[in-house]
Structure formats: C-alpha cells, structure tokens
Amino acid sequence: MILDTSLLLAILQREPGWEQHQQTLERAEVLRMSAGTLQELLLVAHCRGVLEPMQTLLELIDPDVVPVDGDLAERALGIFKRFGKGQGHPAQLNFGDCFAAALAERDQLPLGYIGDDFTKAGF
C-alpha cells in the first residue's frame, strides 16, 4: 500500500473510522511512501502540533520511503497537470497527493487515503 498524508493524519488524530484504517495498515503486506509525501506529512504534522506523535507513528509502521527520482517527479507532474489544484479538475490534488498517486501508479500498489480527492481522479 502507498501511504498518503490523509490516511496517517486520520489515524493519528483518531478521526471517524480511524480504527478501520489502522487495521488496513496492519494487514498491508507492503507499506511505502514517496519522500515527497513524507515531506508534506511532516510539514502538516508540525503545523498541527503533532510532529512528535507522527514521527512515533512512522517509526512504528516503518514504511519504505522511496526517494524522488526523475521518473517519479515527471509522473507526479503529469498527475498534477491532470488533477492538481488550480488545474480545473474537481480532484484538486496537492503536492503530496501527486507524489502518492505517482508512486501508486508506478508501483501498481493500492493507495491508502482518506477523502474523495483521489476518487475524483480515478484512483
């Protein structure tokens, strides 16, 4: 499973349905996230005052963090052009979303997320 910021924040902040999402994480054979998504996650966690608990959660689940290479950056750009904020599509994917979607698309793994932005984009 490719991790998106929304999923990890929902679990950490115990948003409605968080237990089910945590079980999904526990059942996943692979947990992976883009370094671009990780950067967004850490910035958002810092701004919400939950950076240390988020770092603890990341240590517990220990996802493989995939570096952003040229291929992944180009894929994320392509996703942004189609579905990104300000591009006229209802999905309005943000920076971290584009990297999560690009990695899921490239590695052919399911995308773990909360909300309907990715659904609007067809993920």
Range-by-range predicted roles:
Residues W18, L38, L51, A73-L77:
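A general structural signal for well-ordered alpha-helical segments in protein cores
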Residues L3-D4, M33-S34, L93-N94, G115:
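Histidine- and aromatic-rich ligand-binding microenvironments
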Residues R27-L31, D62-D64, E105, L109:
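Short active-site oxyanion
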Residues P53-D71:
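Generic detector of contiguous secondary-structure segments
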Residues E105-F123:
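A generic hydrophobic-segment detector
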Residues V66-P110:
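Active-site neighborhoods of divalent-metal-dependent phosphate/nucleic-acid chemistry enzymes
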Residues L8-L9, L38, A73, F118-T119:
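A generic structural signal for short hydrophobic patches within well-formed alpha-helices
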Residues M1-M33, L43-E59:
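Short, well-structured N-terminal submotif of metal-dependent ribonuclease cores
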